[in-house]
């Protein structure tokens, strides 16, 4: 058998923080990319001390190290899309902005991670938040804030669908090309997509599950993968929402806090690949005896 001529899948880059429980951050991004038949590479912008119960502390990667990570990847592999998550501080946000300017990537999805959902720890300093709003928004194809992040970036108090739409429009006014305001923390599982021309309200079944750790990271990564695979924006967002909904439904508990999503629910019940089968015991050759010396 030879694999020399297998086609290379789309190569996607995540720039984010590392979660040791692997429910959120880079681990969630890479699992999502793989589940969408893409190959993921990663630049670690921060290490976090956390579990599903919350973030205890963060350790931001020095800007020079993050720049070196990005340069090493860009010099070696053809990155077609970038997903941005936790950056930690303004210095790292500036490194990412410079990298995007040099890279000319087809798709950039910005998940403006500011605070941890569990525990509320700060994941981006105040100067970084301002830089994100002033500089990174306009470098992204899609921005995916949750309610709290949209409120922080726009100053709009969001209590209903109309306020979600207003926040999405304001973020586009500030430079984003398209915005998805995630309503997962509201009473109904409704998201709002604004592409600069029209508003699309995305309804969905609210899954009764506590296993939602990393759902925001997963959603942004799924959008990235769908865009990189050639889907138009509206279809990419709808497919990403459907994927996350099912992954939450199939999620499982691993510890004392909210469990992770099942990023690979699609393959758990698939038949084995063609050509793979069980070999009867009598058809196997006995192990060779070691050679005497």
Task: Label every PLM stretch briefly.
Residues 3-9, 25, 187-202:
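Acidic-glycine-rich active-site phosphate/pyrophosphate-binding loop
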Residues 37-41, 199-200, 226-240:
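Phosphate-handling active-site elements
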Residues 32, 151-152, 209-233:
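Short, small-residue alpha-helix embedded
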Residues 9, 57-60, 234-293:
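Charged C-terminal helix
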Residues 3-14, 26, 30-122, 267-270, ...:
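Conserved N-terminal subdomain of the carbohydrate kinase-like
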Residues 15-21, 199-213:
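Short pre-catalytic strand/loop immediately N-terminal to key active-site residues, enriched for Gly-Thr
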